[in-house]
């Protein structure tokens, strides 16, 4: 992403997810330095069901930067606006030199804006979009230099028996759906990257060059698309570049911050979806792309579904992701996962 100059970041805390692992998995497969919170539970009075949740965040393993901090952070806020039926879960994946400061800033301000918005229950989608766009402007105007730093965000707002999902970037939310004797993964968000034809065309219309690193460096023909899809692509995905420079090189098409990338179509407007919960919905997962880089949504749901305790599900998914990272690369990304189980929900 390149170096940037810090204006003044001392007032912004480090990530609440501060695992300090100095190396890969321990011999028994357990993550070192992980930050896992106690089991949490929420009762939703209307329509009378329970949620049980856990979160785990693991700092990435970077051999060349052993002291690199965890740029992921997360937020679990119960009873927004004092309403026992409204709850918020979010994961924020920072990037760039000041990614940690960006992810913490956005985490705090998004939930504050939603909490203060009188239209939240009347029109959650409108409230979501307003919050992210306003936070983006606040970040630009803050003491944090976000010219080449920012954060993605995946958030879930529970409003009674409905969940509203707002996505900015390439983190993901997935719902586990019981279908007879199977548990199926239903994506609640869709990664906003140049792999998506609609997003690729949108940023190109804004002036972005969409090329892999090898293409930008002249190792491959820039006029021939060298990537197929996200699952089959190796370690050289399509990225966004200005017309006459080798920056910013973002692998996503939406984020909060990234002021420089806005000139080539990177936007902070979230895509918002809604699902009406039913007894067939068992749990949902909210996680950074550190989880999903090498694990498809169905594999994550299969793994989490084996465990009665969401703490165990978090640990298993994080450990498997960590292992797969090291099998494919000599490092791992930061990894953050929230699992929320849905219990005692009836059709009545």
Curated annotation (Swiss-Prot):
The keyword Cell membrane does not apply. Residues 11-24 have a biased composition (Low complexity). Pfam families: PP2C. CDD domains: PP2Cc. Residues 52-342 form the PPM-type phosphatase domain. Its EC number is 3.1.3.16. Keywords: Hydrolase, Magnesium, Manganese, Metal-binding, Protein phosphatase. Residues 11-40 are annotated as: Disordered. Gene3D superfamilies: PPM-type phosphatase domain. It is an enzyme of class 3 (hydrolase). Mn(2+) 1 binds at residues 93-94. Mn(2+) 2 binds at residues 93, 289, 333. It catalyses: O-phospho-L-seryl-[protein] + H2O = L-seryl-[protein] + phosphate; O-phospho-L-threonyl-[protein] + H2O = L-threonyl-[protein] + phosphate. InterPro entries: PP2C, PP2C_BS, PPM-type-like_dom_sf, PPM-type_phosphatase-like_dom. Binds 2 magnesium or manganese ions per subunit. GO terms for molecular function: metal ion binding; protein serine/threonine phosphatase activity. PANTHER family: PROTEIN PHOSPHATASE (PTHR47992). Belongs to the PP2C family. This is Probable protein phosphatase 2C 35. The lineage of its organism: Eukaryota, Viridiplantae, Streptophyta, Embryophyta, Tracheophyta.
């Amino acid at each position: 992403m390149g170096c940037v100059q810090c204006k003044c970041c001392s007032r912004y805390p480090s990530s609440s997810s501060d695992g300090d692992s100095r190396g890969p998995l321990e011999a028994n497969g357990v993550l070192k330095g992980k930050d896992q919170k106690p089991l949490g539970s929420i009762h939703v009075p209307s329509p009378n069901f329970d949620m049980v949740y856990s979160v785990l965040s693991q700092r990435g393993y970077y051999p060349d930067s052993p002291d690199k901090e965890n740029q992921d952070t997360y937020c679990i806020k119960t009873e927004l606006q004092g309403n026992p039926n409204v709850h918020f879960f979010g994961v924020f994946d920072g990037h760039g030199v000041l990614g940690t400061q960006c992810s913490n800033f956005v985490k705090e301000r998004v939930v504050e804006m939603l909490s203060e918005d009188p239209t939240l229950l009347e029109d959650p989608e409108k409230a979501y979009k307003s919050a992210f766009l306003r936070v983006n402007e606040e970040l630009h105007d803050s003491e944090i230099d976000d010219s080449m730093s920012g954060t993605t965000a995946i958030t879930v707002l529970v409003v009674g028996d409905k969940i509203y999902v707002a996505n900015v970037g390439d983190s993901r939310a997935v719902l586990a759906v019981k279908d007879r004797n199977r548990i199926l993964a239903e994506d609640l968000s869709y990664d906003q990257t140049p792999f998506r034809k609609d997003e690729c065309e949108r940023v190109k219309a804004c002036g972005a060059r969409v090329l892999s690193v090898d293409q930008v460096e002249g190792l491959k023909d820039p006029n021939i698309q060298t990537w197929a899809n996200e699952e089959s692509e190796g370690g050289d995905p399509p990225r966004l570049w200005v017309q006459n420079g080798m920056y910013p090189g973002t692998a996503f098409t939406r984020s909060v911050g990234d002021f420089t990338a806005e000139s080539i179509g990177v936007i902070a407007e979230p895509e918002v979806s809604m699902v009406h919960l039913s007894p067939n919905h068992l749990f949902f997962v909210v996680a950074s792309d550190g989880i999903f880089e090498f694990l498809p949504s169905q594999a994550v749901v299969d793994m989490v579904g084996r465990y009665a305790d969401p703490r165990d599900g978090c640990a298993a998914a994080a450990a498997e992701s960590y292992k797969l990272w090291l099998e494919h690369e000599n490092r791992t990304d930061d990894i953050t996962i929230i699992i929320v189980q849905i219990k005692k929900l009836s059709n009545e």
